[in-house]
Structures are given as C-alpha cells and as structure tokens.
Amino acid sequence: MPKMKTKKSAAKRFVVRPGGTVKRGQAFKRHILTKKTTKNKRHLRGSTAVHDSDLNSVRAMLPFA
C-alpha cells in the first residue's frame, strides 16, 4: 500500500477545527471588486464552514488533520 500523503493544495485552503468541522475562506473576493456592492464584499469577509456534502472529499484530502 502506498504512503498516505496530504494534498498540499487542500492543506493551504482548509482548517479542521477540534469539533470536526472544516473551515474555508470565502470565494469571489480576489478581483473584479468594483462592480460588487459594499454590502456584498462585507458579507464575503471572514470564513465559513465547508458544506456537509463536501466534507468527505475534504477529509480524504487531509488524512492527518
């Protein structure tokens, strides 16, 4: 059986909390911000949790987290 490895691209994007939930950053906040409203940009601040349907995929990419 080959060695298990962490997907480094996923390790840079996700943080696993002690309770088991996975934290991720918000999308749509990098560029083309002039046409987005201030309210929209404000709501994109901070981080949010990964959706339940994506949790298994993210956890498979982070076997040691």
UniProtKB/Swiss-Prot annotation:
<dbReference type="InterPro" id="IPR021137">
    <property type="entry name" value="Ribosomal_bL35-like"/>
</dbReference>
<dbReference type="Pfam" id="PF01632">
    <property type="entry name" value="Ribosomal_L35p"/>
</dbReference>
<dbReference type="InterPro" id="IPR037229">
    <property type="entry name" value="Ribosomal_bL35_sf"/>
</dbReference>
<protein>
    <recommendedName>
        <fullName>Large ribosomal subunit protein bL35</fullName>
    </recommendedName>
</protein>
<dbReference type="GO" id="GO:0003735">
    <property type="term" value="F:structural constituent of ribosome"/>
</dbReference>
<dbReference type="InterPro" id="IPR018265">
    <property type="entry name" value="Ribosomal_bL35_CS"/>
</dbReference>
<dbReference type="InterPro" id="IPR001706">
    <property type="entry name" value="Ribosomal_bL35"/>
</dbReference>
<keyword id="KW-0689">Ribosomal protein</keyword>
<dbReference type="GO" id="GO:0022625">
    <property type="term" value="C:cytosolic large ribosomal subunit"/>
</dbReference>
<dbReference type="GO" id="GO:0006412">
    <property type="term" value="P:translation"/>
</dbReference>
<keyword id="KW-0687">Ribonucleoprotein</keyword>
<comment type="similarity">
    <text>Belongs to the bacterial ribosomal protein bL35 family.</text>
</comment>
